[in-house]
Amino acid sequence: MMKATFYNKRLLCYIDDTDFTDYQGIGADPMYLRYDSVYGIVQNHIAEEYRDFLARPFFEDGLIYWYVAEWIETPVQLSELDSSKKEHYEQIKEETLKQYANALSQLNADEYNILSSALKYINDDFIYCYDDKVVLVAWGM
């Protein structure tokens, strides 16, 4: 298993790409291979505090490794949180999704297609919570 190194990022988890069947993509490439295209839109249209929502993927040998901003508090899946913490992070998730929805309404057609494909499936099992932020792995799948 080879690991990538990304500045200020840390490996959170990995998934097998065969676990998913409905890949979103750009041309023939699945979204996880077009992170730079997606992040370019995020960087230009999303407030800085919400830009880390989409984890950075790295694909190798059938596995997709997901990297996120460095953490202090150990990340936990949203679906696994106890009720008090879950309520707190649900609110952060809703604020984050609102930012992305507002951005979608202002994008040109190409940017809209790219970002909406990345956000098509959002499942709490793939949202990790830490340090008062939420991040999504397995996006665009």
Q: Predicted segments — roles?
A:
Residues 1-141:
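Cytosolic/nucleoplasmic/matrix-facing N-terminal domains/tails
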